């Protein structure tokens, strides 16, 4: 196990005390809001640090007592009984704190932009893209998050050729960021008379929703085109005369939106563009840091096949962590927490391993 970063722990305690003092002094409302946000972020970490420090002190006291021959035998026997318990508590606390003290992803608390595109497999791929969107929509509903479709292009037989949506809530990106990649489906299409299993795929991209403070977009770097657009109808698609296409000239990124008004379109297209540019920046930074990355989880490679959904066997396999679950029906209803948590645990384990190598 990697050693706990003692200096970092002391710095967090010092900062926490400083925030408490500043909040007690009655600062201006905007300053108080920022301090309160940092306070709530630090509180669980500092609370755990204090519990750990108390346990370490208790262990030292017990060991001193055991070595002191002037202490009566009964007291030493009690100390000997308590010792394994305290050691076990310290070990458990160290494991918890390793996770709490891992470097934080600045985007983890953000909302997210979800993009799903049908890949190989024609109309069956579009149907699968629709199934994936509903899966994430139900997961979001269970979490109390808000889902809003920004644009959608329906498949001829249903589903979506492409669908882009915002998922708004605290910590959405942290939960869904490992969903990016190629999702493959194996099933018998309804139109398949011979009962043969077909394989098709859809690509998922989960981007942290960027705010204006995160990324600057200069007016001279974008071209805005307005055009007539009509969607294919359906629950999530609006028919409009005011579709907007925004091209970011330096990167070549193109975003379209077809809401009911040009103002809404421009705002939503800019929202997606900002998030794509922010994500591209994060990807560049990650690739510079990832030369020694051991974990396939979190590699950010969206061309990588990450998961297979085998309908005849009711099986879902995540290839990055070799996890297979026979609960496909429940997962398609939005019960993806088990996979999400397993991916996060694997990623954290790889971070801990790297920290251990660095020390």
Swiss-Prot record:
GO cellular component: a single term: cytoplasm
Pfam families: PCRF (PF03462), RF-1 (PF00472)
Source taxon at top rank: Bacteria
Region feature (Disordered): 280-306
Record note on modification: Methylated by PrmC. Methylation increases the termination efficiency of RF1.
Alphabetic keyword roster: Cytoplasm, Methylation, Protein biosynthesis
Keyword Ribosomal protein among UniProt keywords: no
SUPFAM superfamilies: Release factor
Subcellular location: Cytoplasm
N5-methylglutamine PTM sites in chain numbering: 235
Gene3D superfamilies tied to this protein: 3.30.160.20, 3.30.70.1660, 6.10.140.1950
Keyword DNA-binding found: no
Entry-linked InterPro entries: PCRF, Pep_chain_release_fac_I, Pep_chain_release_fac_I_sf, Prokaryotic/Mito_RF, RF-1
Single annotated GO MF: translation release factor activity, codon specific
Family: Belongs to the prokaryotic/mitochondrial release factor family.
Function: Peptide chain release factor 1 directs the termination of translation in response to the peptide chain termination codons UAG and UAA.
Protein name: Peptide chain release factor 1
Chain's gene name: prfA
